[in-house]
From Swiss-Prot:
Cellular component, GO annotation: TAT protein transport complex
Descriptive protein name: Sec-independent protein translocase protein TatA
Organism field: Methylibium petroleiphilum (strain ATCC BAA-1232 / LMG 22953 / PM1)
Function: Part of the twin-arginine translocation (Tat) system that transports large folded proteins containing a characteristic twin-arginine motif in their signal peptide across membranes. TatA could form the protein-conducting channel of the Tat system.
Disulphide bridges: none
Length: 76
């Protein structure tokens, strides 16, 4: 009595099909499959090493010469 037999599962399946309908179950299955595929693609993309190493950005000296350092005064 601890486990369900095949007949129990078939009756449950029949009730689910009658309640939701085959079209709704088909849509749920395709949505679930798309979600699993998206998850696998996300995991695969996150585990790959970057192909191109990041390049160091050099400071533009002409822009630094024109920069003015100011302090904001607090309005009283």
């Amino acid at each position: 009595m601890g486990s369900f037999s095949i007949w129990h599962w078939l009756i449950v399946l029949l009730i689910v099909v009658l309640v939701f309908g085959t079209k709704k179950l088909k849509n749920i299955g395709s949505d679930l499959g798309g979600a699993v595929k998206g998850f696998k693609d996300g995991v695969r993309d996150g585990s790959t090493a970057p192909a191109d190493p990041a390049q160091q950005v050099t400071a533009n000296k002409s822009a630094d010469a024109n920069t003015v350092d100011v302090e904001a005064k607090q309005k009283s």
